[in-house]
Amino acid sequence: MGLEFGEHNPRAATDIVFKALPIVKSNLGAELGIESMMQLANVFRGNMEERQGWGYHDWGSWKAYFKTIRKIGQLKRNVNVNKVLTNDFIAPANDFDVSQVKADAQKYSLSAELSKVDIDKIKGRFYSNVVK
């Protein structure tokens, strides 16, 4: 639910993190903090058309990951994905009122500092730091 909230209002999600962890605010500042929150939401959200909700595990991706880290020596033996992952909790974990979360995110009262951050500017450069 928290990532859904952040998807609808990354500035508000950043404010909540800053209040809970002031060191994050002092280390990142408003703009980088918001951009980081947006990147996290983007990665964790993925393509919701292909997924069955927040937290859904794609077996093929996990198999490839475990195979790769085994190949580079990070694991000593193969991992059976079926023994370490489950999607059994995805449906109940995603059983919340998305429209209410969106409404709560949109009405969140922002500080002046976070209100000034231009989300469209961040989106415009969102992939400019991608390693090619």
Segments predicted by a language model, with ranges:
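Conserved C-terminal helix/tail region of periplasmic/extracytoplasmic solute-binding proteins
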Residues: 63-132
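Secondary-structure end/capping motifs
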Residues: 1-77
